Amino acid sequence: MATTKKVLNWLRREARRGLTIGGLCTAAYPMAKAGLLDGKRATIHWENQDSFAEEFLEVDLTKSVFITDGNRLTTAGGTSSIDLMLKMIADKHGEEMANAVADQMIYSSIRTDQDTQRLSVPTRIGVRHPKLSQVIQMMEQNIEEPISPAVLAKDVGMSTRQLERLFRRYLNRSPKRYYMELRLQKARNLLMQTDMSVINVALACGFASPSHFSKCYRAHYETTPYRERGSHAQRLSI
């Protein structure tokens, strides 16, 4: 996300004045670039979590729908901005007023900063199988250093063959294929949302070499990582 020096300087100037500054969704990027989120808890849309975390190590990034940390406010975007607004109303005017506003808006489920953004794994994949969900969660949490199917199976009390059958039955693909798709999805996000080198993107997604990464990426997306980044940059410049 391109941000001009003028915008960054303006943000820093307003921050020095002690103003409360908030960013909705990807507006957390200019806030972080201006140093406004250093040492602060913050959030951003789940699609941008990986790239944001790679770029801003000094920010305590969470998966919450919104975060208030002192006079810094961030949201995941979408309807989470409504949740933040209702919290601000509740803080200043009480829960009754916030509930009345939500009722007027036909907003029946008010979330707090303890609520996470994404749907549960069973809801996302449309399958309610505890062990399958557990394995997918482990995969999602271990992209940089992938876990072998044998270890994944052992961790949920299954044999490798049983795990293979489970994935093919419910997801129509092998555990290895599903895991690879998760890693490539993260790689694609990093290529399009960060300035990380292709080599570093490969390492961040568990690939030992750029050549292997490029081969897998091309097989899945029908283009190379370098071309993906180039075409994305070209689209942004139009």
Model-derived features: where do they sit?
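Conserved anion/nucleotide-ligand pocket segment
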Residues: 64-106
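Short, basic, alpha-helical segments at the C-terminal edge of helix-turn-helix-like DNA-binding modules
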Residues: 43, 179-188, 227-238
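DNA-binding recognition helix and immediately preceding turn/loop
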Residues: 112-177, 194-205
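…primarily DNA-binding HTH/wHTH and HhH modules…
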Residues: 193, 204-238
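A conserved active-site-flanking secondary-structure segment within enzyme catalytic domains
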Residues: 37-65, 100-101
